[in-house]
Amino acid sequence: MAPSNLPPVFNATSQDIEMLLAAQCHLGSKNLQVHMEPYLWKTRPDGINVINIGKTWEKIVLAARIIAAVDNPADICVISARPYGQRAVLKFAAHTGAVAIAGRFTPGNFTNYITRSFKEPRLIIVTDPRTDHQAIKEASYVNIPVIALCDTDSPTEFVDVAIPTNNKGRHAIGLIWWMLAREVLRLRGTLASRETEWDVVVDLYFYRDPEAEENKEIEEAKVPGAEEVGAAAIESGLVGDSWEAQAAPAFAGAGVPAGAAPGWEAEGGVDWAASSAAPADTWAGESGNPDAGVKW
């Protein structure tokens, strides 16, 4: 990491650098946009562009200082059309007082004053300049400064402050928003000092898959050991190690000795064919005298 140009009080700690590396904030894409070249550290043999983490931290601090300079937190609008950043912007807005737009950005939010969702923010922060291009385009029409999380292949047109980071991973996006919120609270004085740990864990900013959470709740609600014994056995109460011991009393009550095992062979040498050989009426014999014994 290159030496930082920040005052010593703003220098990143070793824990901050470890978190940025663990969340893979330094891994960019294989494409490189010309304006993102100053933030490039090197290119790996497989073509992945590695971002300079020192530049990322400097831009986080710069963006936090810009956000803290806005008097009214409600004049800041945070936007994320990318699903991985929607939970992060909602948490950022809850902790800093900003206004969040999570999901689709309605065209005309910043330019069409007739719409109900019309807003006039003094600053907007977007998760991805490519997916949030509509918000950046409208901000350029009304002279709103833009802070954006930019990958190595992100377009930087109309972006005033670009935070170089991986903006496609759920952990990278959540961590950058968490660090940005923490720096804003430190500059506002909400956190007593820079040595004070923030009691909000970074996991709250991570994207969570609704289907995965639902499946997890279903797994936790299952009866322990239900898969081994079966659902029908749990309902009938026949749960145990020996099925023969539980089935013996039922056969004993039906006239079968308790120790005898039930079988399909007939007892006592019964011949089923002999019992079925009883004389049967023949229609041929009756057809010789059809009127015999018939009274109408």
Swiss-Prot record:
Q: Which PROSITE patterns match?
A: RIBOSOMAL_S2_2 (PS00963)
Keyword Cytoplasm belongs to the record: yes
Taxonomy, top ranks, is: Eukaryota, Fungi, Dikarya, Ascomycota, Pezizomycotina
Q: Which processes are annotated in GO (biological process)?
A: ribosomal small subunit assembly; translation
Q: Which protein family is it in?
A: Belongs to the universal ribosomal protein uS2 family.
The protein, known as: Small ribosomal subunit protein uS2
Membrane spanning stretches: none
Q: Species name for this entry?
A: Ajellomyces capsulatus (strain G186AR / H82 / ATCC MYA-2454 / RMSCC 2432) (Darling's disease fungus)
Identify the HAMAP family for this entry.
Answer: Ribosomal_S2_euk
Q: Which CDD domains does this entry report, sorted A to Z?
A: RPS2
- Biological role: Required for the assembly and/or stability of the 40S ribosomal subunit. Required for the processing of the 20S rRNA-precursor to mature 18S rRNA in a late step of the maturation of 40S ribosomal subunits.
Its primary localisation, in coarse terms, equals cytoplasm
Subunit field text: Component of the small ribosomal subunit. Mature ribosomes consist of a small (40S) and a large (60S) subunit. The 40S subunit contains about 33 different proteins and 1 molecule of RNA (18S). The 60S subunit contains about 49 different proteins and 3 molecules of RNA (25S, 5.8S and 5S). Interacts with RPS21.
Q: Name one GO cellular component term.
A: cytosolic small ribosomal subunit
InterPro entries, A to Z? Ribosomal_uS2 (IPR001865), Ribosomal_uS2_C (IPR032281), Ribosomal_uS2_CS (IPR018130), Ribosomal_uS2_euk (IPR027498), Ribosomal_uS2_euk/arc (IPR005707), Ribosomal_uS2_flav_dom_sf (IPR023591)
Tell me the keywords, alphabetical order: Cytoplasm, Ribonucleoprotein, Ribosomal protein
Instruction: Reply yes or no: does the keyword Ribosomal protein apply.
Output: yes
Picking any one GO molecular function of the record gives:
structural constituent of ribosome
> Which subcellular locations apply to this protein?
Cytoplasm
